Swiss-Prot record:
Protein name: Triggering receptor expressed on myeloid cells 1
Known role: Cell surface receptor that plays important roles in innate and adaptive immunity by amplifying inflammatory responses. Upon activation by various ligands such as PGLYRP1, HMGB1 or HSP70, multimerizes and forms a complex with transmembrane adapter TYROBP/DAP12. In turn, initiates a SYK-mediated cascade of tyrosine phosphorylation, activating multiple downstream mediators such as BTK, MAPK1, MAPK3 or phospholipase C-gamma.
PANTHER family assigned to the protein according to its UniProt record, in alphabetical order: TRIGGERING RECEPTOR EXPRESSED ON MYELOID CELLS 1 (PTHR19357:SF0)
Gene this chain is encoded by: Trem1
Start and end residues of each Ig-like V-type domain: 21-124
Subcellular location, record wording: Cell membrane
Side Extracellular, residues: 21-202
Length: 230
């Protein structure tokens, strides 16, 4: 009896040590806020085809929190939605797919797929999932726009009021006109708008006529003086 009792204790101790030694390696997912987590958890179709599955969160130092579970019948493909969580159960493919949408920083933590049959302990189907959610980059490139102002020439306008009708007339400022007069030569040169109408030939003829008239006067005076003193 004592030997049987000792062997039983040794077996229990050995099994507990083996269970403690089997620690599933975590699978890490690094995502940004607003993205979607997708995890595929395979299971043994011979053992768990007709079993209820669940997606759980493992808070530090607390009991596992069951977020969403599959619904009957378990032998047919089904899809369950619970808030941001979705379970897609496909027994023919021996696959449980989990989706978490619109991730936030507060969703960071440890999760797992399990065979859910309370009050018995859940059976872990896949590696625990370590989810790390970070905020996205808020840096947005804003182009700098520098306005360029070009100076344009505009005509000068003069506004004149005429009474009594108080009508307003707008006209362009005329170009300045300069008048150069030569009394001796009898030539008048107009510079400005009127000067454009005077041709070069008319000016030349006027100058020649003036020189001839002066020459004739000089000759007449010379003849008169000679006769007087002759």
């Amino acid at each position: 009896m004592r030997k049987a009792g000792l062997w039983g204790l040794l077996c229990v101790f050995f099994v507990s040590e083996v269970k403690a030694a089997i620690v599933l390696e975590e699978e890490r997912y690094d995502l940004v806020e607003g993205q979607t987590l997708t995890v595929k958890c395979p299971f043994n179709i011979m053992k768990y085809a007709n079993s209820q599955k669940a997606w759980q969160r493992l808070p530090d130092g607390k009991e596992p929190l069951t977020l969403v579970v599959t619904q009957r019948p378990f032998t047919r493909p089904s899809e369950v939605h619970m808030g941001k969580f979705t379970l897609k159960h496909d027994p023919s493919e021996a696959m449980l797919q989990v989706q978490m949408t619109d991730l936030q920083v507060t969703d960071s933590g440890l999760y797992r797929c399990v065979i859910y049959h309370p009050p018995n302990d859940p059976v872990v189907l896949f590696h625990p999932v370590r989810l790390v959610v970070t905020k996205g980059s808020s840096d947005v490139f804003t182009p700098v726009i520098i306005p360029i102002t070009r100076l344009t020439e505009r005509p000068i306008l003069i506004t004149t009021k005429y009474s009594p009708s108080d009508t307003t007339t707008t006209r362009s400022l005329p170009k300045p006109t300069a008048v150069v007069s030569s009394p001796g030569l009898g030539v008048t040169i107009i510079n400005g708008t009127d000067a454009d109408s005077v041709s070069t030939s008319s000016v030349t003829i006027s100058v020649i006529c003036g020189l001839l008239s002066k020459s004739l006067v000089f000759i007449i005076l010379f003849i008169v003086t000679k006769r007087t003193f002759g």
